[in-house]
Amino acid sequence: MTTGLIILNYNSSDDTINCIESIERVNTSPIKYIIVDNGSSNPYIVPKLNDYLKSKFASKHILLNENDKIPDILPYSTLLVSKNNTGYACGNKKGLKLAYHDKEIDTILIINNDVIFIDDFISPLRRWLWNDDKTMLVSPLILKRDGETIDPNCARRKKTYRYIIAWFIFIFSDIFGILRKMQKELFIINNNEIPSQNIKIEMPSGSCFMVKKKEFKQIDDFDPNTFLYYEEDILSAKISDYGKQCLLIPTYTCIHIGGSSTNKRSSNFIFRTSIESARYYAKKYLKVGFTKYIILYIITSLSLITHIFKNYFYKRIKN
């Protein structure tokens, strides 16, 4: 059987190409690429990416538009072109739709396009995943851009209502280091020491993780109601409700460059999106009551106003 690699591309074909090149250098496991262009606004992105894939994989590559008929069996490489940027969750769902259709794919690896493979970890992660009935999701240890520092986001505890409230209160001024302390409590790995054994985690990094296709489909994979942020929190809640766990395999590593897609969006848009996702997550998955939700709504609204004014005055001073 085969692992389907779903890579989301948005205005960053160079990152996607670098990601694929890194995989091709080290991987020895049977795979299929499903690259989703998530409505790139730059008209040169899709042609450049498609030309690269055709040159690299020749007849083993196809280009699909969003409404094209899905082949029963996908080739080695598929580039799916989406008309609109629908965000992380919905963009990946488009790739998952293709993977679900292909009976040769039994395992799915979700990868950010700014991830660089340094280890041949697909086969080992598959073994860990399929040999443990309690586990639905596995992830390698993820390093930051420098290739040495551990990205603590790869092993986290789930965000609580208290944490979300504190985040939006102290994000502009972390009085007494309250937010920093709460963030430290959120991270399972804080000392940059590589763990000697596998770690059960509540929340993985969305930049690189592996799941069993059938189980991922059963929990309805990503929630389409978020555009950006809180996708991992929601995924963690779904997996927990299903009675399964997430596992970090620290023996194998990859590098996450970070910020490739979000840097191409305005600061106000990103902040507003994070607020919408936080409200949705708190209401549906943390199941907060009416009073707690109103408190969250007021605090996030004030935080957004502060953010907009701060950006406005910063631009005025800069100009």
Q: Where would I find each of the regions flagged by the language model?
A:
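Short, acidic, metal-binding catalytic loop of nucleotide-sugar glycosyltransferases
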Residues: 21-31, 52
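A short, conserved alpha-helix in the catalytic core of glycosyltransferases
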Residues: 193-253
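Short, flexible, basic/aromatic active-site loop/helix in glycosyltransferases
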Residues: 158-201
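A conserved hydrophobic helix/loop-capping motif in glycosyltransferases and polysaccharide synthases
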Residues: 3-15, 19, 26, 36-39
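Short beta-strand-to-loop acidic/aromatic patch adjacent to the donor-nucleotide binding site
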Residues: 104-116
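Conserved donor NDP-sugar-binding/catalytic core segment of glycosyltransferases
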Residues: 116-154
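Glycine-rich, basic loop-to-helix element that forms the pyrophosphate-binding segment
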Residues: 81-100
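Active-site-adjacent helix/loop segment of glycosyltransferases
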Residues: 6, 143, 233-315
